[in-house]
């Protein structure tokens, strides 16, 4: 194997990013993934287990692990933390009855040693529906800033209409590029 081949392989590795797509069940994780992949968002069933999809964003290759959010599956999430560089956390902005559970579950993740230096993208999904909480309201409830001073952001999105989905994933890609270049503080 020549030096040029080794350098090319290293450059490809630098572009690869492992992303976990997490959140409570029925938040819209799989629908968001289908939206990102330009697939039909009307044909979605609950994820029991996980699925892995790849997506090119801003010159990075995201390997996205869409993992089911049912309570019985959350104990297995830790098995996927190794080498994770980003988490996309999906919140159902209509489900105010489960926001405390959502906050507690997210905060458990934020203190995991293997996830301390990950970028966190919070997607307040279903924001196109009347009665949805704003991203500001959800941000206040989740209280992420208590655990992370930087490298997180929240977007109000709609997986069904595509509202703000591309902007959100673009923010994540740019944040990860900044981290990979080593020009940031945690």
From Swiss-Prot:
<dbReference type="GO" id="GO:0003924">
    <property type="term" value="F:GTPase activity"/>
</dbReference>
<comment type="similarity">
    <text>Belongs to the small GTPase superfamily. Arf family.</text>
</comment>
<keyword id="KW-0519">Myristate</keyword>
<feature type="binding site">
    <location>
        <begin position="23"/>
        <end position="30"/>
    </location>
    <ligand>
        <name>GTP</name>
    </ligand>
</feature>
<dbReference type="GO" id="GO:0007021">
    <property type="term" value="P:tubulin complex assembly"/>
</dbReference>
<dbReference type="InterPro" id="IPR006689">
    <property type="entry name" value="Small_GTPase_ARF/SAR"/>
</dbReference>
<dbReference type="Pfam" id="PF00025">
    <property type="entry name" value="Arf"/>
</dbReference>
<dbReference type="GO" id="GO:0015630">
    <property type="term" value="C:microtubule cytoskeleton"/>
</dbReference>
<dbReference type="InterPro" id="IPR045873">
    <property type="entry name" value="Arl2"/>
</dbReference>
<feature type="lipid moiety-binding region" description="N-myristoyl glycine">
    <location>
        <position position="2"/>
    </location>
</feature>
<dbReference type="GO" id="GO:0005525">
    <property type="term" value="F:GTP binding"/>
</dbReference>
<keyword id="KW-0963">Cytoplasm</keyword>
<dbReference type="InterPro" id="IPR044612">
    <property type="entry name" value="ARL2/3"/>
</dbReference>
<keyword id="KW-0547">Nucleotide-binding</keyword>
<keyword id="KW-0493">Microtubule</keyword>
<comment type="function">
    <text>Has a role in the cofactor-dependent pathway of microtubule biogenesis. Required for growth polarity control.</text>
</comment>
<dbReference type="GO" id="GO:0005874">
    <property type="term" value="C:microtubule"/>
</dbReference>
<dbReference type="InterPro" id="IPR005225">
    <property type="entry name" value="Small_GTP-bd"/>
</dbReference>
<keyword id="KW-0449">Lipoprotein</keyword>
<keyword id="KW-0342">GTP-binding</keyword>
<feature type="binding site">
    <location>
        <begin position="125"/>
        <end position="128"/>
    </location>
    <ligand>
        <name>GTP</name>
    </ligand>
</feature>
<dbReference type="GO" id="GO:0005634">
    <property type="term" value="C:nucleus"/>
</dbReference>
<dbReference type="GO" id="GO:0006457">
    <property type="term" value="P:protein folding"/>
</dbReference>
<protein>
    <recommendedName>
        <fullName>ADP-ribosylation factor-like protein alp41</fullName>
    </recommendedName>
</protein>
<dbReference type="InterPro" id="IPR027417">
    <property type="entry name" value="P-loop_NTPase"/>
</dbReference>
<dbReference type="GO" id="GO:0005737">
    <property type="term" value="C:cytoplasm"/>
</dbReference>
<dbReference type="GO" id="GO:0005829">
    <property type="term" value="C:cytosol"/>
</dbReference>
<keyword id="KW-0206">Cytoskeleton</keyword>
<feature type="binding site">
    <location>
        <begin position="66"/>
        <end position="70"/>
    </location>
    <ligand>
        <name>GTP</name>
    </ligand>
</feature>
